[in-house]
Amino acid sequence: MLKRIKVGSDLNKKESLLDAFVKTYLQTLEPISSKRLKELANLKVSCATIRNYFQILSKEGMLHQAHSSGARLPTFKAFENYWHKSLRFEVLKVNEKRLKSASENFGLFTLLKKPSLERLERVIECEKRFLILDFLAFSCAVGYSVKMEKFLLELVGRSVKEVRLIAASVNALSLARQLERLEYSSAQITRFNLMGLKTLLNSPLFFDILEGKVLERFKKGLHFIEPDCMLVTRPIEFQNERMQLLCVGKLECDYEGFFQTISKEE
């Protein structure tokens, strides 16, 4: 059953009508005529007025005509505008029981990542041949040099991520790559609805998304990664622990509805 959409009393503004249009499309996923928008969004304006706005919004690149009937579809520009205005990225308390089913029902691939909390405990020098970096849960080794030993000793107490980023910044790439593998193998990653990634099989980002590495590359928020797909990252509280949530899907997936569904009620 479709929800009635309330867009306020100032219905003659383009933005209000465009928001109502996109919300209605997210519920129906069908081309929308002026008459259907008026009915479903409960708009208190005439169909003629709505058609006039359709023409204006089409000229502005927000809508395009689906076929000769005059029904319209939202464009990439309309979705981009709508999602930037609608989504929030504060810490969300998540109901773990709903996450799997909601990911499937809303057609989204979701990934939870609990970062590795390991810190560099000590640096062990082995006969002037190797330096072992001990993170307690794991360790790695690099070739010995006085300069490298001094550099690493200054990093004792830092997280594995911090050590990796600093190593990369000074061009110690072999060490950075080792730490990246260890960091991701020790991180706790949970995935839901892998079918949500099927449209990205040929994307250069596919494996970075699957492994959660895009959480390193993209800051918190909304990112448009393909012509018809987007990616959302945000911090969450899951099972009383702070984690990162990654959501990937098509532009027309109902991200608002998804976040409302998985939100833990106080």
From Swiss-Prot:
GO terms for biological process: negative regulation of DNA-templated transcription. Keywords: Repressor, Stress response, Transcription, Transcription regulation. The keyword Repressor applies. The keyword Transcription regulation applies. GO terms for molecular function: DNA binding. Negative regulator of class I heat shock genes (grpE-dnaK-dnaJ and groELS operons). Prevents heat-shock induction of these operons. Belongs to the HrcA family. This is Heat-inducible transcription repressor HrcA. It comes from Helicobacter pylori (strain J99 / ATCC 700824) (Campylobacter pylori J99). The gene is hrcA.
